[in-house]
Amino acid sequence: MTRAAAPFTAWDGLRYGALGLPLAFVALPLYVVLPGHYAEQHGVSLATLGAVLLGTRALDAALDPAIGRAADALFARSTRAALTVAAIAAVFVALGFTALFHAPLEGAALLGWLAAGLIVTYLAFSVLTVVHQAWGARLGGDASQRSRVVAWREGCGLFGVLAASVIPLQFGVDAASAVLASTLVVGVGLLAQSPRSAAQRTGPPAHWALPWRSAPFRALLAVF
């Protein structure tokens, strides 16, 4: 007989979901505040900024499948290993975000700084996001519990979006950097105390093209 899973409490939800706040906080300033900052403070054209943002984001998107496979390997090794990588990624998210708004260079070197900062921030953000979401997926449970897990993560993310829409504009980018760093520390700290999945036996990985055989999956991609 298998032992019933422990109920997923509100405290469990907060410990798992809290990291969703800083993860949601990151994106809005990069897409809304950063272009205006570089245009006003450094005189960079919006077209150039858009090209750099698009190029670095495309690179990150191309690497996402590899990040996912690496996350699977981390969890197969141990949850502690995944948590360690998440903590390191959180440090680079905070450093990259702060560096983007405190560029010490001008001219062509400034664009290099911008591209490097975006690559570091995007990649670290992707690693942290994939680990966080995989952590929640591995908690398992019935449909009701899985819904609660996602609701806590996305609910905390909603607060992150609201904070990101106010803090940089009202209090400045230094305050935004401080809020991001502090909430990352709290989020990773709470994640370390959140429920963990039991060790799972997994078979060989499925073929990468398998999702394309699903009509609902193809319909979902059509939205994008």
Model-based region annotation:
Residues 2-224:
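Membrane-embedded alpha-helical bundles of multi-pass transporters/translocases
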